[in-house]
């Protein structure tokens, strides 16, 4: 618990120093603040202040939007540094999120841990050819974007990984999975 609190304090201090948006929000925090003392934020406010909440001051909403106009950029690094993802917008307010290499590595590790939490699942995966198929919405979303990123980084995995668009008719998804 102490380590988690220390890391949270470091993260909040970093955000406060490097993001004008969070710097303003965190300015009045007491010295001995707890997680519940942090002001809440929402997607609408974050997108309205996009250029102010990012901690990398070189990234702008205009540059991100320009990058996202080309669907060939799905799974590519913007400026050689960031994968760009969006939330689905199911609430009517999609949020654009940037992942650096560290964030992507942590996300990938957590995905593997969740997928193969049981030893028998990992054993079956190894025995049956080490192939994975995922069904995500196609676009700049975390699921499909991260699969495309992995395939760009490791093209030799092309026959081992597949992403199917969730909006594809079910019969077509089943056919593709059976062929895979």
Listing of model-derived features with the role each one plays in the protein:
Residues 1-86, 93-131, 138:
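Nucleotide 5′-phosphate-binding alpha/beta core
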Residues 10, 17, 137-180:
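Conserved adenylate-forming
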Residues 89-92, 143:
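Glycine-centered flexibility sites
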């Amino acid at each position: 618990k102490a380590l988690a609190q220390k890391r949270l304090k470091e993260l909040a201090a970093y955000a406060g120093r490097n993001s004008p948006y969070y710097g303003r929000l965190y300015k009045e925090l007491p010295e001995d603040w707890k997680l519940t003392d942090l002001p809440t934020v929402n997607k609408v406010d974050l997108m309205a202040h996009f250029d102010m909440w990012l901690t990398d001051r070189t990234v702008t909403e205009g540059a991100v939007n320009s990058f996202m106009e080309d669907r060939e950029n799905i799974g590519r690094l913007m400026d050689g540094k960031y994968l760009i993802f969006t939330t689905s917008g199911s609430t009517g307010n999609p949020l654009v999120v940037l992942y650096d290499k560290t964030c992507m590595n942590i996300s990938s590790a957590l995905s593997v841990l969740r997928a193969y939490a049981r030893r028998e699942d990992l054993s079956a995966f190894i025995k049956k050819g080490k192939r994975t198929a995922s069904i995500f919405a196609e676009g700049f979303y975390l699921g499909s974007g991260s699969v495309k990123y992995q395939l760009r980084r490791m093209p030799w995995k092309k026959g081992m990984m597949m992403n199917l668009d969730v909006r594809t008719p079910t019969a077509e998804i089943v056919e593709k999975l059976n062929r895979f």
